[in-house]
């Protein structure tokens, strides 16, 4: 199992230092997200000073950028990292695409993302092999690529494309044509086994691929410490985050996979602005299903037991204050996960 560092929202120029620290702790990969900053600029800083790490976006929002724009950014990062870049894409939701990015939302995110990836790969094929650019789909059309705008071939042209999603359609799309899939941190083993993996495997089989062709990646809610008191403190922060996700109708299917019926109550509380009361509505047993609860000395094995071969890469959505302040213990946990 590989272990990845997720760069928190911060200025791109600080990513180099963060990457060096991540490498020193033994992390395998360095992932960025599109939140308060562009997801690509931190990687340009980090890749220069941490040549032993893999890099990826988790995720970059696809639809506000054209496939050709995204293709060029990924191509340049694949060149800079010498093939150690993984392009992670997400669809976001209508409100963000339309109101935050002022872009069009066609209402068919999975079919649109399929075309988006096909169009990007057509651009890369044109640059690498000289294939005339000709892509025609329902949402995207590309037919112009002159030598002046062609960056030319690179050593590692097969840029891995990962997508993120919650529901069955994007899980299936990953199985059909992607190199990897970012499992949303708000998940349970039941949801992986009943929704994500079956849909992914079915689509992979229909496309003459296998589940092994899709690397599954996720971040984990970690609730840990050296004592019961420290673990309970760690739970409190996770409980608040879980209450937020559970209140969002988009994630309701995760609750349904475990027969949990308290999602609508949280939604109603959020609409009333009762944010400070929502965490108390999350039952204790739910925390152990959406995250990992274990003392530090057995944390790595507990994560391995939870995921088995369900995922191949993990990161830490939360660590708890005890582990965050103990680099030696964190380094050991990372090493144990990798062994």
Q: In which residue ranges do the predicted regions lie?
A:
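Active-site-adjacent structural elements that line small-molecule/cofactor binding pockets in enzymes
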Residues: 1-339
């Amino acid at each position: 199992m590989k272990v990845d560092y997720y760069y928190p929202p911060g200025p791109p120029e600080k990513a180099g230092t963060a990457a060096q620290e991540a490498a020193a702790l033994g992390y395998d990969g360095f992932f960025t997200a599109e939140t308060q900053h562009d997801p690509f600029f931190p990687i340009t800083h980090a890749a220069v000073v941490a040549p032993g790490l893999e890099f990826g976006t988790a995720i970059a929002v696809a639809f506000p950028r054209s496939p050709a724009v995204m293709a060029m950014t990924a191509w340049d990062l694949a060149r800079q990292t010498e093939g150690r870049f993984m392009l992670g894409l997400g669809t976001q939701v209508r409100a963000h695409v339309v109101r935050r990015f002022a872009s069009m939302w066609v209402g068919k995110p999975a079919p649109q993302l399929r075309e988006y990836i096909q169009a990007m790969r057509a651009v890369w094929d044109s640059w690498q092999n000289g294939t005339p650019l000709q892509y025609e789909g329902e949402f995207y059309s590309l037919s112009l690529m002159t030598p002046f705008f062609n960056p030319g071939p690179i050593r590692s042209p097969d840029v891995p494309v990962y997508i993120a999603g919650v529901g069955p359609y994007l899980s299936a799309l990953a199985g059909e044509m992607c190199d990897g899939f970012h499992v949303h941190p708000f998940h349970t083993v039941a949801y992986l086994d009943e929704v994500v993996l079956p849909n992914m495997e079915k689509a992979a089989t229909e496309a003459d691929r296998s589940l092994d062709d899709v690397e599954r990646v996720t971040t984990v809610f970690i609730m840990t410490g050296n004592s019961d008191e420290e673990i309970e403190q760690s739970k409190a922060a996770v409980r608040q985050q879980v209450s937020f996700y559970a209140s969002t109708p988009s994630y309701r299917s995760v609750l349904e996979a475990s027969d949990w019926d308290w999602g609508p109550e949280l939604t109603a509380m959020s609409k009333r602005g009762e944010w400070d009361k929502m965490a108390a509505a999350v039952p204790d047993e739910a925390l152990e299903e959406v995250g990992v609860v274990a003392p530090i000395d057995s944390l790595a094995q507990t994560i391995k037991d939870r995921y088995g071969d369900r995922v191949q890469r993990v990161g830490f959505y939360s660590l708890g204050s005890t582990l965050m302040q103990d680099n030696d213990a964190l380094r050991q946990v990372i090493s144990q996960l990798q062994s």
